[in-house]
Amino acid sequence: EEATLTWKQLLVHHPGGYYGWRAAARLGKEDLNLQPSPAGTAEEATSTPWQPLASGDAALDQLWRLGQPTEAWETWRLRRGGLPPKDSGDLLVEGRLRQGVGDDWTGLGQLEKAAFLLKPEQCSLLPQLEQALHPRRFAETFAPAAEQQQLPLSLILGVAKQESRFTPAVQSSAGAVGLLQLMPATAAELAGNPLTTEELQEPKRNAGLGAQYLKAMLDQWKGDPLATVASYNAGPGAVQGWQTPDRSRFPEVWVEAIPYPETRIYVKKVLGNAWSYQQERRPAC
């Protein structure tokens, strides 16, 4: 009964993310949908409802409303005088402005910090923050790849957000490249020939190969999202060594026992992203 109450409270106040998913699944309300996205979902996936900036600055809000994000960003920078954002409200505004000028890498980082620092009295910011945290960047590129590989678009978006924050040119210190952070050796195996860094940074090619690898992992683990996403990060060989007889009964325990801290966090982030992309989650204040 105590566990059920905890799940219910989580679902009301934190319906998005990994723990929102696990709460909904444990209560039998809804689960992560791993069915293929319907054909022709690209246009629908990119149609994120417009939201006012609500910065408290009438001129800035007007520029945003008129579809001039660059001018709005420059106005914000000028008025801030180089000062960093001081609280969740500032982080939300600046993060959204950065997104508006194509800087998802920094913008999403600021929005995540805003969510972490959010105070109870700022609860009214949650719907705006939740939407901004889950942009559907490159959906027109990911949707055909998802359709070809029979994957849900929400899962690919969840991986891309965590891997690259939707930044095609990003490269990791380990050598992974592009939107879905493919290792050159893995990409060459999937493509049947070596690819240059520039080729791997091309969104369509990266999306196609990344979706192909993600599908291979999903098939290998017979549709288990936890092992699939862990394998995408740590490799299927490592994940094979972490299997336990009761993993399907106690998936939350299995995740917490993942010996690689990076992979443990990665699994929660990616599947939490996918859950939030699957359907808009609105927390209750």
What residue spans do the PLM features occupy?
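Catalytic glycan-binding domains that act on GlcNAc-containing polysaccharides
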Residues: E1-E30, L34-Q51, G82-C285
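Alpha-helical segment of the N-proximal tetratricopeptide repeat
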Residues: Q51-G82, E94
